[in-house]
Amino acid sequence: VIIGSFLNITATLNYLIDQNLPVVIHCAGWKEAPNIEDTLYAGALTHQLLGHEFLADNDAAKMALDLYLQNKNSLLKIALKSDHAERLKKFGITKDLNFCLQVDKYPHLNGRLMGSKIVKI
């Protein structure tokens, strides 16, 4: 299990291509429910993977892909409509969304799940 985001989407993509294994994208969500920003990322990664002979063969992947394709030019606008954005507004930190939606700010993978811990790669 690796941890990816918009911030390192190309590094994540390259790692998955190099592994040449089936991919399952699991979105963290919030309190056992999906959220917009994670689903946008899943759609963006799915979009990238489709260009490398991977398949989007279930409804969740197709819905994430559609959400991303419909909003790829206005990610922040749609993310600011999310429940998570409302939570961030209460703390005065909506700028975090803008940061997290930056594409390829970091050219490497940051973390991997090993057992029950996230470790640096």
What is each PLM-predicted segment?
Residues 1-49:
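Conserved mixed alpha/beta catalytic, RNA-binding, or beta-rich assembly cores of soluble enzyme
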Residues 36-43, 47-121:
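Long, charged alpha-helical interface segments
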